[in-house]
Amino acid sequence: MDIPHIPVLYNEVLETFKDINEGYIIDCTTGFAGHSSGLLNQNQNIKLICNDQDDEALAFSKKRLEKFENGVIFNKGNFEHVIETFKDYEIRGVLADIGVSSLQLDKLERGFGFESLTLDMRMNQNQSLDAATVVNTYSQTELERIFKDYGEVREYKKVASLIVNNRPFNSSKELADFLSKKMSKGKLHPATLPFQAIRIEVNDELGVLERLFDSLEKAKLKDCIVAIISFHSLEDRIVKNYFKKWSKSCICPDNVFRCECGNNHALGKIITKKPIIPTALEIKQNPRSRSSKLRVFKFD
């Protein structure tokens, strides 16, 4: 079958989970099953829980992994719920690749790309909120908020004002072309960060990621490796801060002179002191991997 996707940091992910010989690994964002197929080929003693909220991605991954049918459970849903759903299973690994999939980027009708003829950007196509609603109905103040907080757009007020005074916009292409004409040029396309902000708002991406971490903490997993691939600083900051929190033995307030908590609260240890990034060769072969970062934590 034609495989339309190159998984990011593929070898690094396989290396991360190579010593797991039993139990389940949850692939929170299965997509085209690039990582999942690699993990199953590497070690057929493990079983996988393949989760995705995209119907098309799940259908493809079921086809791709059919030879492993006895070792795979498929689940449709947002990854914020997957740990709670499978809390009674022996979970030994959790993988989340939280970027937009190639499936979503390359399909013009999904509205993620600059050439898309819709203004959608929903990862779950069953939800009601889409990019058109955000762009064409949000107040200028609301747009300023998302461009500042989710896109870190330097001229967030200008972008919001331009959109409000020139809407409605009917497609991502129309919006991208408009911003390209109106905004100053730099290393990035002028629509890159505004599109990121709109996409995060539509899919509540940062909230979903935080709720995944909260569910991992609540589950009290034992002897479990958690590997997260992020693609921008907002996501990476969340991953880094949770891992740092989980690795701390002392949870006393900073103003306490002497530890009073027992100094025994660490849930595990950070495996990657610095994030793993793609090699120059991988970036050349797959330019979309350029901004990816892999961080790994191990629950004791």
Swiss-Prot record:
Pfam families: Methyltransf_5. Its EC number is 2.1.1.199. GO terms for molecular function: rRNA (cytosine-N4-)-methyltransferase activity. InterPro entries: RsmH (IPR002903), SAM-dep_MeTrfase_MraW_recog (IPR023397), SAM-dependent_MTases_sf (IPR029063). Keywords: Cytoplasm, Methyltransferase, rRNA processing, S-adenosyl-L-methionine, Transferase. It is found in: Cytoplasm. S-adenosyl-L-methionine binds at A33, G34, H35, D52, F86, D97, Q104. The keyword S-adenosyl-L-methionine applies. One of its GO terms (biological process) is rRNA base methylation. Its main location: cytoplasm. Specifically methylates the N4 position of cytidine in position 1402 (C1402) of 16S rRNA. NCBIfam families: 16S rRNA (cytosine(1402)-N(4))-methyltransferase RsmH. This is Ribosomal RNA small subunit methyltransferase H. It comes from Aliarcobacter butzleri (strain RM4018). The lineage of its organism: Bacteria, Pseudomonadati, Campylobacterota, Epsilonproteobacteria, Campylobacterales. The gene is rsmH.
